[in-house]
Swiss-Prot record:
It comes from the Eukaryota. Keywords: Dioxygenase, Iron, Metal-binding, Oxidoreductase, Vitamin C. Pathway: Lipid metabolism; fatty acid metabolism. Signal peptide: none annotated. InterPro entries: Phytyl_CoA_dOase-like. This is Phytanoyl-CoA dioxygenase 1. Converts phytanoyl-CoA to 2-hydroxyphytanoyl-CoA. GO terms for biological process: fatty acid metabolic process. The lineage of its organism: Eukaryota, Viridiplantae, Streptophyta, Embryophyta, Tracheophyta. It catalyses: phytanoyl-CoA + 2-oxoglutarate + O2 = 2-hydroxyphytanoyl-CoA + succinate + CO2. It comes from Oryza sativa subsp. japonica.
């Protein structure tokens, strides 16, 4: 049997037309459990010194902690995790927004998935020549306080010339409209990149204002644990707050082609060491 990432012609046509693709049962229940258990261990060992993550307020990207997370395993709290007194309102494990951005390199459990045959086969199907994971994130979408992710395109933040970013979003729990699943505008990737986030010596800024979108154009991408959503770098996608009592854990990888595509020196994420490719043609 071919790896789960080997795409059929029909799947490739759907991805080309819509800018996303859902692959059912991409990871086994055992693989999902291994990643969730490993993250629980990492959180348990976390001393509580992190930063607040928000997709609305980009002041945090001035923060040296955020920039250094490119090659570290760093913990980011939910915006609503703290009370007026500055203390956590709930347990530590229910307060973290995400962990990033180098799990795929520094942790053996997440590296096993990221460099596995399924992921490599997927990018071979997409005709990548020398794909490399540029960042990885474990996203918790905590019950009751899981923050929204505003409409965006991944190429805004992870730009190559020519653009080559593809996102992989692996559900580690069922994702529904109730607990904050992804939403996307089908075909929106065909309209090109709307704006970029630019990093200079001390700050970041966007080169254009945020576009406005009609919420009626978005469709929900409800998936089961173990399913994978493949996301074109120019696809408009988002997720709403999780106001439910149920979390929505997911692993997100962003992959670029390092052959024939140049990583922008204006991206927020700058590495001291080039990323390891999944394979080389």
């Amino acid at each position: 049997m071919p790896p789960a990432g080997s795409l059929t012609d029909e799947q490739l046509r759907f991805f080309d037309a819509n800018g996303y693709l859902v692959l059912g049962s991409f990871s086994s229940a055992e693989e999902v459990r291994a990643m969730r258990d490993r993250m629980a261990e990492l959180v348990d060992g976390f001393d509580g010194a992190g930063d607040v993550f928000s997709t609305k307020d980009h002041r945090q990207v001035k923060n040296d902690f955020f920039f250094k997370s490119a090659e570290n395993i760093s913990f980011f709290f939910e915006e609503k995790a703290f009370g007026d007194d500055g203390c956590l309102k709930q347990a530590k494990e229910l307060s973290i927004n995400k962990v990033g951005h180098a799990l795929h390199e520094l942790d053996p459990v997440f590296k096993k998935f990221s460099f596995g045959a399924n992921v490599s086969s997927l990018f071979s199907s997409l005709r990548y020549k020398r794909p490399a994971v540029i960042q990885s994130m474990y996203i918790f979408k905590q019950p009751g306080i899981g923050g929204e992710v505003v409409p965006h395109q991944d190429n805004t933040f992870l730009y190559t010339d020519p653009p080559s970013c593809t996102g992989l979003w692996l559900a580690l729990e069922d994702a529904t409209k109730t607990n904050g699943c992804l939403w996307a505008i089908p075909g929106s990737h065909k309209n090109g990149l709307k704006r970029r986030m630019i990093r200079d010596e001390i700050d970041t800024h966007f080169d254009h204002p945020s576009p406005t979108y009609d919420l009626k154009e978005f469709v929900p991408l409800e998936v089961k644990s173990g399913d994978l959503v493949v996301i074109h770098g120019d696809l408009i996608h988002q997720s709403f707050e999780n106001l439910s009592p149920v979390s929505r854990h997911a692993l997100s990888l962003h992959v670029i082609d390092t052959e024939g595509c140049e990583w922008s020196k204006q991206n927020w994420l700058q590495r001291k060491i080039p990323p390891q490719p999944l394979y080389e043609n």
